[in-house]
Amino acid sequence: MQACRRCIAPPLFCALKILVAITGASGALYAQRLLDNLNPREHEIHVVMSNYAQQVVAEELPGGLKFPDGVKPHGLKSMNAPFASGSNPPDVMVVIPCTMGTMGRIAHGLSEDVLLRAADVVLKEKRKLILVPRETPLSLIHVKNMELLLLAGVTLIPANPSFYSGAKTVVELVDTVVARVLDHIGVPNKIAPRWAEEKE
């Protein structure tokens, strides 16, 4: 796992400070499955949601978003959140799912709320920023924003499920994307089959 300032006997274990940001793109299940597979007993997990994300969650997830015990939610205007300053940045920030509007604001350094401020902090402190865009088709503006972000070192993992896994449910399809997100965070997982992987 990657090194961080909270390493305990590396490389055996590395506790990470992870911020999960949820925006208003359709695909709230991606965020739920990511949270389901991050262990707050092993990592420090924070969550922030945009206003539109709360509406989408209400429509797409019966019963709402479920936070595992130990996950720390923050309001969108909570500028005193522990990840809102370069003196205390997260090790990893994941925006899942990520709207094109959020992507554009991050690409151009806008920080009108704590979600966007956190992304700005992660970029300037050279920590890991992962965006999971869910939009189709893409405009030239979207692609140019993606180019800016890639040049800045951002990891883009489009919410495109793989079908070679033989998934039989929506959750299993979603997990093929979430598995890749976990890989890039640095969290070992077996939630989805790997290409050409021998079955146990």
Where in this protein do the model-derived segments appear?
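Cysteine-centered motifs
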Residues: 4-7, 14
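A cross-family phosphate/adenosyl-ligand binding-site feature
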Residues: 12-200
